[in-house]
Regions:
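Short, conserved clusters of charged catalytic residues that mark active-site
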Residues: 51, 77, 102
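Rossmann-like NAD(P)-binding element
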Residues: 56-87, 91-92
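Rossmann-like NAD(P)(H) cofactor-binding subdomain of soluble oxidoreductases
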Residues: 81-119
Length: 119
């Protein structure tokens, strides 16, 4: 059986907790992304993620699921970036943002057709 790859975008408290929980499943591979190398180092050292990167394309390239766990204002920019990246067909994108209407409306406008957004 092929492992499911989940990209956790933002490995701070929320993203790190999500990653730790998901990593309990041996069939899931967690790739963490953060702009802060110290957050990635902590996530790797605590075993929350299998791999970490500061390059968004590297984080999402093989992902079956992309979990956005960044501050709301950054989620908008990340959604914009995702539309220009090489994503797996059928990839699911979801978020932990506290403001749903704005994020969902923005995702509808910018997410490519081969991507499913669950807000």
């Amino acid at each position: 059986m092929k492992r499911t790859t989940i990209a956790v975008i933002g490995v701070g408290l929320i993203g790190g907790s999500i990653a730790l929980s998901l990593k309990r499943d041996p069939d899931i591979r967690i790739v963490g992304f953060d702009v802060r190398q110290d957050f990635l180092d902590k996530a790797l050292n605590t075993g929350a993620i299998h791999a970490g990167t500061t390059d968004l394309q590297t984080a999402v390239r093989e992902a079956n699921v992309i979990f956005l766990a960044a501050p709301v204002e950054q989620i908008y920019a990340i959604l914009e970036s995702l539309r220009n990246l090489d994503l797996q067909p059928g990839v699911i994108v979801t978020d932990a943002g506290s403001i749903k209407t704005g994020i969902v409306n923005h995702a509808i406008r910018v997410i490519p057709d081969h991507v499913t957004f669950i807000g």
